[in-house]
Amino acid sequence: MKPVQLVMNSFITKPIQTIHNKPLTTVNVVLYYVKSIEEKVNLIMTEFVVYDAMMGSGKTTQVKEYILQNPNERFIYITPFLKESYGVVGINFNIVGDEAVPVFNDLTNDIDYDESNPLSRLRFKYPDRKKGKGSKENSLSHLMNIGYNITSTHQLFTHMSINSLIGADQYTLIIDEALSVYEETNLVSQKEVTRLLKIGILYLDEDGITVRFNRDKFGDNVKLDTDKTEGTSYEHLAMMCDLSQLLLIDGKTLVWEMSADMLRKFKKVIMCTYMFEGQLFSSYLKKHGIEYEIIKFGKKPSEVKHLFNVLDDKKLNSIGASETALSKSFFEKEPTKSTGRDACKRHLNTVMRKWGAKTDNRIFTCFKKDKTVISDVRYNKNWLPFNCRATNDYGKVENVAYLVNVFPSPTLVKAAKGKETDFDIEIHTLTEMLQFLYRGCLRNDLPMNIYIPSSRMRRILFKWLNSDFEYMKVLNDGD
């Protein structure tokens, strides 16, 4: 078949013979290019705004006001946890085990809403597996198709199929805290990746990291038609390659990347976070050429510095003296019963007793693998993941132990950076630490006792409190 080349509204296409491995016909060529132009228009029209403010500075209030001022718009509001999202949009819920379960109103045959919450008037819905024939993704897609306001989680949104976002161009997407847009994946073993690259079934795009699937080669090797991966163990791999969602880092590690077109589908995107420029999500947007506006407000570090009662004890801090002490690699190099873990266990107990911290007035973090050894029975219920965020359940806690030294995954940083993007590891580390500390009473402008044995983490925290980051100086100069 002779290659086809179309020129429409200045969008020049390359000669093609197939679309998604299907032979060209007049009908599917027209539909394909109409869809392509529609997507390019959406690329231009999507507005991306970041509300950048310290935790407890009123970002959620800003979002609520925006929604109330634009009641005729359609909204999708996503958070890390459903409990927080239900509270924001006015859905009553009960806690069953560890899960937030919405209350159903038998009189209205609908969700039970908190009428004292102004957003309850907009009658937000949530994805329901039962109504989606066993799939929350199907349910969310159905709700979008009808045009409801919707609340959901990061996890569901980031792993949706782009084809499920029906009518997204009519919606404003509101994201509470940055999305996790990269994950290391074991979809295919490293050995299998090497083999598939060698025989040409997989190959790398021009950027040197995006993985592509060659169906022609696949057919030659497994004796299937050239456009058939359906029903094979490679079907999902091929689909993810089609969506540009697999990256190969350092020639060995496969990384899943959320499709940037997921965001481009929407009319507008609003994200609420703090120090956005220090997050992988910021690098991700730059890498994909998505422009954004940052609106900053709220307090400066100097205004809250007096609330941070950071323990200054040479003996108790000695376990974190070196630059990499208490990091993930530091603990991985030690045996399970190690000097570092045992010291953390002893010092955690010493510090909490020193502060007179009762069970309901203390939290701590360490890496999950070390939790059992460090927490013991006494502190087991006080542990939270070091990357915990977007929960207000611990707003009265006054005593916090931060027993980690956080470095971003080098693999994910390489995935996010691309060739032109800078990434500040210290700012990333700072944002992770602040998110955890602000789960406690700091978010309510109350003083907190803080134990951070890592000398590196303390240095970064004080650098922020003194506004010594160049990034912070730029922001402060702009006030």
Q: What kind of feature is each model-predicted range?
A:
Residues 51-54, 96-103, 113-129, 197-384:
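Positively charged, amphipathic N-terminal segments that serve as targeting/anchoring signals
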Residues 95-159:
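Inter-Walker segment of RecA-like/P-loop motor cores
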Residues 11, 15, 19, 25-45:
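Pre-Walker A adenine-sensing motif
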Residues 74-81, 270-271, 361-368, 449-453:
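Conserved RecA-like ASCE P-loop NTPase motor core of nucleic-acid helicases/translocases
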Residues 167-197, 202:
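SF2 helicase catalytic motif II
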Residues 46-62:
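Walker A/P-loop
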Residues 71-109:
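Conserved Walker A/P-loop ATP-binding site and its immediately adjacent core
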Residues 382-460:
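Conserved RecA-like P-loop NTPase helicase motor core
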